[in-house]
Design a protein with these regions (language model features):
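Catalytic cores and adjacent flexible loops of soluble metabolic enzymes
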Residues: 1-220
């Protein structure tokens, strides 16, 4: 993630990495990895998806108690129960805390997965951010499947999230769909359409489906 000339590292090994086949980390294993990440100087550690299981909830709490330098983040959908679980899991953290909420913005995901119209998605983004803003140190909001979304609609969602209190906006290539130059052009277009992004940290999340994950990160930064 970059804000001006500052590049920060958001590590999601303990959340997205744990979705790899055959991987299930205990709270103690998450703590061991988190301590190593802290020693490496990682800025943000996404410790888990609090509502998904008691183990993930406890993993977030354990990581928050074990590290102090990195910000510890918990993932949440835009549902109130997700958001409250994330806040609760972070309540005893030693360092800075972040709730990372998300909702899909691509036409296919809005229609087939969410069953929502675009205005409803915008309202859910507003609700999610405003529900946790002030209860944790930072709020991140992601437009899931951003690269298959209309840039103008993504800009609207970003604007709404920032006005509600989001400090970081993430525009991920959720399904590993775009080439590096395509995602970079998409980011530039969204920034043009949403000048409010100057008030937030802009984040990218790249997948390696096409075996160009590292190249994608470099191009998008």
């Amino acid at each position: 993630m970059a804000h001006g000339r500052r590049i920060t590292i958001f590590d999601t090994t303990l959340r997205d990495g744990e979705q790899s086949p055959g991987i299930a980390l205990s709270p103690d294993e998450k703590v061991e990895i988190a301590i190593a990440l802290e020693r490496l100087g990682v800025d943000v550690i996404e410790a888990g998806f609090a509502i998904s299981s008691p183990g993930d909830f406890e993993g977030i709490r354990a990581v928050g108690a074990a590290v102090s330098a990195p910000t510890v983040a918990a993932l949440a959908r835009t549902r109130v129960e997700d958001l409250d679980a994330a806040v609760e899991a972070l309540a005893s953290a030693r360092g800075r805390t972040r709730v990372h909420s998300f909702i899909a913005t691509s036409p296919i995901h809005m229609e087939r997965k969410l069953g929502l119209e675009p205005p409803e998605v915008v309202e859910q983004a507003r609700f999610a951010v405003s529900h946790v803003a002030g209860r944790v140190d930072e709020v991140e909001f992601s437009c899931e499947d951003a690269t298959r979304s209309d840039p103008a609609f993504v800009a609207e969602v970003c604007r709404t999230a920032i006005e509600a209190g989001a400090t970081t906006i993430n525009l991920p290539d959720t399904v590993g769909y775009s080439l590096p130059d395509e995602h970079a052009a998409f980011l530039l277009e969204v920034r043009r359409l949403c000048p409010e992004l100057e008030r937030a940290t802009l984040s990218v999340h790249c997948h390696n489906d096409l075996e160009i994950g590292r190249a994608s990160c470099r191009e998008r930064v």
